[in-house]
Amino acid sequence: RESASENEITKHYLLENSEKYGVKQSQNLYPVMNEKNILNEKIRISRELEKLKKIKQKELTKKQQNTYMILMDYLKRQKNLSMYPYYERILGKTSGQQVQILLTLSEYRLKNEKDIKSYFRLLQGLDGYFNSLIQYSKEQVKRNLFISDQSLRGVLQQIQSVIKRNKNNILVATFNLRMAEIKGINASQKKRYCRKNKKLVRTKVIPAYEKLYSHLQALKGNGQNKNGLYYYKNGKEYYKALVA
């Protein structure tokens, strides 16, 4: 329940009718990547591990024991990774957060007007999410953990391609298709929603990408390591935790 309520994106992905499970409205639209949240996540993982350790395995069924072992293994991995909070590669030409969020939004479940309004809030809040990516990247620069210029060029090229395709953005095309499949909303209202989506992409999404591009371009020259995660300070230990 705690994981599902962390942000709107996660809640919507995990639960279709979150109210039935007692999950309240999320305060955050997106995952927040800042020092406070990183610390809170460390604390949460430690607490979950302590709770799990108190469970008597002998009293569990075979199926429950399997679930227990999987969860224990997962939490231990996450605890190890939490020791390296600024090593994560959040930016990438094909797998970075700036790419993944477009795919997530383009596949956002739309079954009713509540879902549509939630989706619109996410478009309006994209700039805030990108601000957290910018701040995270600046923290990586301070710690000499920022991506190389070669990798950054790929990221900037991808962002530029999104900006250039502002009129035929993936969020416009996929939204129109999903709207056509929704039942219980009349045709005129669907058209209004499609127009609003197009406007939000133009006035909120594209400017958010333009701002991200500008800030990341300013960080060019700060990536000291061209040889991968292993070659950062403590990179060997981080890589072991990552692939364990």
Predicted feature locations:
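N-terminal maturation segment of proteins
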Residues: R1-A244
